Amino acid sequence: MSAAAQVTDSTFKQEVLDSDVPVLVDFWAPWCGPCRMVAPVVDEIAQQYEGKIKVVKVNTDENPQVASQYGIRSIPTLMIFKGGQKVDMVVGAVPKTTLSQTLEKHL
């Protein structure tokens, strides 16, 4: 079971933009190999930073509106939102250390 909640076009504003804590958004698709590689890393981050950040996933096939709104061209793309604004992003399957360092800047 994934530690990250699934977010849709209709719940993105409520779950991400209106969040009181920073949010890591994993834009992914079921057919994407690198997305499957980074998924366990995203889950580890969700557990490691529980209570400090919220971690959610957006399936770009099922939710094209949010993906196009944020200019998602390749997946996986991991974006960090804080106070309703995109503050950082990482593209591609990255190691946990890279993702942690990126997140730490926004806590």
Curated annotation (Swiss-Prot):
<comment type="function">
    <text>Participates in various redox reactions through the reversible oxidation of its active center dithiol to a disulfide and catalyzes dithiol-disulfide exchange reactions.</text>
</comment>
<dbReference type="InterPro" id="IPR036249">
    <property type="entry name" value="Thioredoxin-like_sf"/>
</dbReference>
<feature type="disulfide bond" description="Redox-active">
    <location>
        <begin position="32"/>
        <end position="35"/>
    </location>
</feature>
<protein>
    <recommendedName>
        <fullName>Thioredoxin 1</fullName>
    </recommendedName>
</protein>
<dbReference type="InterPro" id="IPR005746">
    <property type="entry name" value="Thioredoxin"/>
</dbReference>
<dbReference type="InterPro" id="IPR017937">
    <property type="entry name" value="Thioredoxin_CS"/>
</dbReference>
<keyword id="KW-0676">Redox-active center</keyword>
<keyword id="KW-0813">Transport</keyword>
<keyword id="KW-1015">Disulfide bond</keyword>
<dbReference type="GO" id="GO:0005737">
    <property type="term" value="C:cytoplasm"/>
</dbReference>
<dbReference type="InterPro" id="IPR013766">
    <property type="entry name" value="Thioredoxin_domain"/>
</dbReference>
<comment type="similarity">
    <text>Belongs to the thioredoxin family.</text>
</comment>
<dbReference type="Pfam" id="PF00085">
    <property type="entry name" value="Thioredoxin"/>
</dbReference>
<keyword id="KW-0249">Electron transport</keyword>
<feature type="domain" description="Thioredoxin">
    <location>
        <begin position="2"/>
        <end position="107"/>
    </location>
</feature>
<dbReference type="GO" id="GO:0015035">
    <property type="term" value="F:protein-disulfide reductase activity"/>
</dbReference>
